[in-house]
Regions:
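Short acidic/glycine-rich loops and adjacent helix/strand connectors
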Residues: 1-141
């Protein structure tokens, strides 16, 4: 089996999985970081919130994101460069939270992140019957 799939399989078999959930939406206020313990599987899954913090975005990062945020015309090179930068910054923010909480990174099984939302295209806006609501997120890493 692929070693990465094997690792995911092994995590799924654990009685308790520690998962970091990230949320960074259109308000651009910062990154919400939630550490949860998951027990069980399927409809019997139980979730316990262990820690939560919001790490604010500084003014420079907000300005950089706003250059590509919710615009129909953007500099795609800037978008491409911002894509890994957001991932790296989110990683640094995660590490700061873990340090603040006194939790070693080795105790985290997974990080669930959709990235930083930069564009919403709801069906009411694009008007295409064959497509639903859609969004674009960045934050590779």
């Amino acid at each position: 089996m692929n070693p990465y799939l094997q690792q995911l399989y092994n995590i799924a078999q654990k009685p308790v999985r520690h998962i970091l959930g990230l949320m960074s939406g259109t308000s651009l206020d910062g990154l919400d970081v939630a550490l949860c313990a998951l027990r069980g599987a399927g409809p019997n899954t139980q979730v316990e919130l262990l820690q939560f913090s919001t790490v604010p975005y500084d003014a420079a990062l907000k300005a950089e994101i706003r250059q590509v945020f919710a615009k129909r015309e953007i500099d795609f090179q800037h978008l491409c460069l911002l894509h890994p930068k957001i991932g790296i910054l989110h990683g640094q923010m995660i590490n700061a939270c873990l340090q603040e909480w006194g939790i070693p990174a080795t105790e985290v099984d997974l990080v669930a992140s959709h990235g930083q939302t930069v564009y919403h295209a709801p069906k009411t806006q694009h008007g295409l019957a064959e497509y639903g609501n859609t969004t674009l997120q960045i934050g590779d890493g």
